[in-house]
């Protein structure tokens, strides 16, 4: 028998822990599925928890939060089960593969009916196109000049429910997209990467092995020169016995070491910021991938909200955004942004690179942004294009 298969070996204990985690995740997912099934049998006659059931919308709204919470638990626990099962190459499962399949089938039987409707009640493509093409001025129901049949009224009410549901989902998802990556960035920066990089601090390295670019320590040279001049002025104006050259040399050496250590610390802090930003970006991408349905709904809602604006407002937003890239006021703004970025990542400030960036990149972004917006306006709002052309003339 191989050594890593011995009972009590670290590898065996690790695989045993993975097995227990996988079984626990699968059991938790099954418990959540059974909770949904219990609500279905008790209050919805064994059918789907939906607003169009015999119980009505009020009962559905009461159990909606419970349904969403249990579905989220199932998704999370199944992801845990798949991840631990992927990492575990051991066959030391406490339950057989047949029992796992039975549990997965039982869970799938319950959640399958909510797979495509948990985020949004689907509307047929024809009715969605009709909603998108309705002008905001004509979307007021008090201005409809025709008689509505019962079927038309039900369709309109269903569309309104879908819009309210879209707004709720989009608002929550946008809040999650903002706060979760920020939280991950802050926590990883202070709890993970900062202590890790601290092991490579500069005070354990010989000074002779430290090399910096001239741009990096130019600021510290200026600060050292000011400190030296201040020390000389204090010595000249002091009524006490002036410091000897050896004492002055010690003070200057102490200040130089402090500034070099500060420069190295700032450089290390840039590495910490870079790693933390990458962690926040990874969290953002994971949220987009895991909640792909919600991201699509949010995109559709934002697009519909923008199209619902009047043409003058659309053109104003377009001009405002394009002027942010190129304009008499934007050059200094780009300088401030680039200086903050270089300081954030601990990079040396290069004025020539900043000027080249300002002379090329904003112009390219402005042209690309105008092309995309014109293409979008031409397809979705031709009137806005006409208004914009008149304003430019």
Swiss-Prot record:
Superkingdom, taxonomy of origin: Bacteria
Cellular compartment(s): Cell inner membrane
Keyword Ion transport among record annotations: yes
GO CC, one annotated term: plasma membrane
Keyword Manganese in record: no
Record note on disruption phenotype: Reduced H(+) influx activity following dark to light transition leading to a delayed transition from H(+) extrusion to H(+) uptake. The double mutant missing both PxcA and PxcL is impaired for light-induced H(+) extrusion and later exhibits lower H(+) uptake activity. The double mutant missing both PxcL and FlpA has both reduced light-induced H(+) extrusion and later lower H(+) uptake activity.
PANTHER family, sorted: CHLOROPLAST ENVELOPE MEMBRANE PROTEIN, CHLOROPLAST ENVELOPE MEMBRANE PROTEIN-RELATED
Function (record text): Together with PxcA, contributes to transient H(+) uptake following dark to light transition. Required for H(+) influx to activate the Calvin-Benson-Bassham cycle. May also be involved in CO(2) transport.
Family: Belongs to the CemA family. PxcL subfamily.
Protein name: PxcA-like protein
UniProt gene name: pxcL
